[in-house]
Amino acid sequence: MTNIRKSHPLLKIINDSLIDLPAPSSISSWWNFGSLLGICLGIQILTGLFLAMHYTSDTATAFQSVTHICRDVNYGWILRYLHANGASMFFICLFLHVGRGLYYGSYIFMETWNVGILLLFAVMATAFMGYVLPWGQMSFWGATVITNLLSAIPYIGTNLVEWIWGGFSVDKATLTRFFAFHFLLPFIIAALVMVHLLFLHETGSNNPTGIPSDMDMIPFHPYYTIKDMLGALAMILVLLTLVLFSPDLLGDPDNYIPANPLNTPPHIKPEWYFLFAYAILRSIPNKLGGVLALVLSILILIFMPLLHTSKQRSMTFRPLSQCLFWLLVADLLTLTWIGGQPVEHPFIIIGQLASILYFSLILILMPFISIVENYLLKW
């Protein structure tokens, strides 16, 4: 008699993707972040659902409703801080997941990679809209500045911005629609995750060597279920440490001041996970140019399969490419730091140089070094 998990129509799907899934025997802890992202999404949807039960998306009461959640709702404070810091954990895992993909050449699976980029954009949009909801100073001015960037689009820009705002400024209509979309998008993200996994399971996982591992596969359960549980435990430990000891570490103090359209904060900046893109935006003096650079800083990932000139898939055996990869990581950390600094000397020039280096590394230096490595290996 066949085991029910292999014959039942629903259990069969779960079995084929979580239990009997053939996985390469050599995948390292860098392959843990997919499951961690799934856990992050689950935490965000659950905490968000309970927060939405007490939140009101009205400009007059939004700030008060968040205060009410923290002060009066049973365990409301932990829900709020789990949700806020859960977003930070989500992005840490996302950046590490994408970084792993770049290092080990996972972008060769083009369908999986492209759905992943779509997921990245969806998560960024969700996080941005979520940051507006508490209706503090940084929420209001962040929403004003970022949505205003669309006015740089020729001809339709101004109309587009007013259409998104639902009026002539960020107001009640904007807050209400942002709440609606912030609630809806995570479920769309969950559906996209299914598509992402569907494409991944068509090809099977990559591995650190970049060499096909079809002849050396092991079942996902128990080997990788236990490994993922260890990763999940570590991530939850970090998240709870952050929530229980320093919940406002990654937030902005200005967001504890209720939104005031008549008073602009001295330094408008987004959450830390957008600072690298914000620095690239600010480093170009032209508005349209800045917006294009901002979009391209993420969209450039789409071109990775086309920019892959090496005869090897992974960077494991390519020391020159490894140097450039870690230079790119250092450059992104520099951009993140610059994004949080005021627009003055020497931060302006550092930001401009870091932005030039970012695009040069991805578009010119890394493909060129790969060709050099091919030549050195006489390929």
Curated annotation (Swiss-Prot):
GO CC entries: mitochondrial inner membrane; respiratory chain complex III
Disulfide bridge positions per record: none
GO biological process: mitochondrial electron transport, ubiquinol to cytochrome c
Highest taxon above the source species: Eukaryota
Binding-site positions, heme b b566: H97, H196
PROSITE patterns: CYTB_CTER (PS51003), CYTB_NTER (PS51002)
Annotated SUPFAM superfamilies: a domain/subunit of cytochrome bc1 complex (Ubiquinol-cytochrome c reductase) (SSF81648), Transmembrane di-heme cytochromes (SSF81342)
Transmembrane segments: 33-53, 77-98, 113-133, 178-198, 226-246, 288-308, 320-340, 347-367
Subunit: The cytochrome bc1 complex contains 11 subunits: 3 respiratory subunits (MT-CYB, CYC1 and UQCRFS1), 2 core proteins (UQCRC1 and UQCRC2) and 6 low-molecular weight proteins (UQCRH/QCR6, UQCRB/QCR7, UQCRQ/QCR8, UQCR10/QCR9, UQCR11/QCR10 and a cleavage product of UQCRFS1). This cytochrome bc1 complex then forms a dimer.
The protein's name: Cytochrome b
Protein's job: Component of the ubiquinol-cytochrome c reductase complex (complex III or cytochrome b-c1 complex) that is part of the mitochondrial respiratory chain. The b-c1 complex mediates electron transfer from ubiquinol to cytochrome c. Contributes to the generation of a proton gradient across the mitochondrial membrane that is then used for ATP synthesis.
PANTHER family attached to this UniProt entry: CYTOCHROME B
Swiss-Prot/TrEMBL keywords: Electron transport, Heme, Iron, Membrane, Metal-binding, Mitochondrion, Mitochondrion inner membrane, Respiratory chain, Transmembrane, Transmembrane helix, Transport, Ubiquinone
GO MF terms, alphabetically ordered: metal ion binding; ubiquinol-cytochrome-c reductase activity
UniProt binding sites for a ubiquinone: H201
Keyword NAD: no
Cofactor note: Binds 2 heme b groups non-covalently.
Species per Swiss-Prot/TrEMBL record: Epomops franqueti
More details: Heme 1 (or BL or b562) is low-potential and absorbs at about 562 nm, and heme 2 (or BH or b566) is high-potential and absorbs at about 566 nm.
Binding site for heme b b562: H83, H182
Keyword Transmembrane helix: yes
